Regions:
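Nucleotidyltransferase catalytic core that binds NTPs
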Residues: 1-141
Length: 141
């Protein structure tokens, strides 16, 4: 939510595109994640939600997207995201990557942290948008 809100003033439209990565174990179904994102940004007409398989740069080309927005929590994210941005640029030179720093209070948040907290029945409300209700019984096993 933080990064999308930061990007909104710079772009006419912001597409929150969820990439399907079969190598990654997701705690919640794609449908559930897409719905949470749609609900989170329901009051923002500039924000649309999509999903895709394959390369992000291919999604961008197919949808006329010129900028990829990424959030950075720290140095590790910067190194990783820089490598990805450079690879994307080699694949499609028309694509630029824009980085935003995550709010300090959210820098500790990752899907792994949230998933572990849920598994241990800890509250995650300070880490996720208020419309997202995460409970251990909803986790995919």
């Amino acid at each position: 939510e933080d990064i999308v809100l930061k990007a909104m003033p710079l772009f006419d439209e912001v597409i929150v595109a969820v990439g399907i990565n079969n190598m990654k174990k997701c705690a919640f179904s794609l449908e559930q994640r897409l719905q949470w994102i749609k609900d989170t940004f329901a009051d923002y007409p500039k924000v649309t939600v999509a999903h895709y398989e394959g390369l992000t740069v291919d999604f961008c080309k197919e949808n006329g997207v010129k900028f990829i927005v990424r959030g950075l929590r720290g140095n590790a994210d910067l190194e990783y995201e820089t490598m990805i941005a450079e690879a994307n640029k080699k694949i499609n030179p028309e694509i630029e990557t824009v980085f935003f720093l995550t709010e300090p209070s959210l820098r500790c948040v990752s899907s792994t942290v949230v998933r572990d907290l849920i598994k241990h029945n800890c509250s995650v409300e300070q880490f996720v948008p208020e419309n997202v209700c995460l409970k251990s019984e909803n986790l995919k096993t």
